[in-house]
Amino acid sequence: MSNMIQRQARRAILLTPENEVLLMRIHEPGNEDVFWWIVPGGGIEPGESLEETLRRELREEVGLEDFEIGPLVWRRQHTFDWAGKRICQNEQYYIVHVSRFEPMMSDLAEAKVLDRFQWWPATELIHATEKLTPLSLPQIVAGYLDSGAPQELPELEILVD
């Protein structure tokens, strides 16, 4: 494996008025037996702002164009292997309130690792038997629904796979 890639990323927790969260089930390139559920988002391109990154990622990954970026609710540093590369990714998670829509991915490269989309009731996230990422997603969503955006962000979650 080559040197570690350092990357900044922004992700959106898409939340409906019915308290559903949109998740994407993805698998490792070339290994459809290893999969997990993630929220949409991705890496910051050179020169992009937070807003530009989230707008591009949500357009590419789920076809969402018209939305307002809500509060920052979580952050983590995730080190993992992807497509033969070691990546250390610093992620920030934002709430985005949306009406339920039919997601559609337009990024062909990412579509190769997408198994499906699913709207999950927030109350069912805690009972998920499949891997969610971040692992604390059920608590993040429940905390936001109970108390709104945190006054102070929790400690940086550090995860090394």
Kindly give the residue locations of the regions a language model identified.
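Nudix hydrolase/Nudix homology domain
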Residues: 35, 103-161
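Conserved N-terminal beta-strand and adjoining loop/helix that marks the start
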Residues: 1-22, 42, 70, 93
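Acidic surface patches and DE-rich sequence motifs
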Residues: 16, 32, 81-82
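Short connector loops at helix/strand junctions that flank enzyme active sites
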Residues: 7, 34, 39, 67, ...
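Tryptophan-centric aromatic hotspots in well-structured domains and transmembrane helices
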Residues: 6, 37, 74, 119-120
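N-terminal first-folded block
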Residues: 20-23, 28-38
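Short hydrophobic alpha-helix segments
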Residues: 25, 73-76
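Unchanged
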Residues: 44-68, 76-131
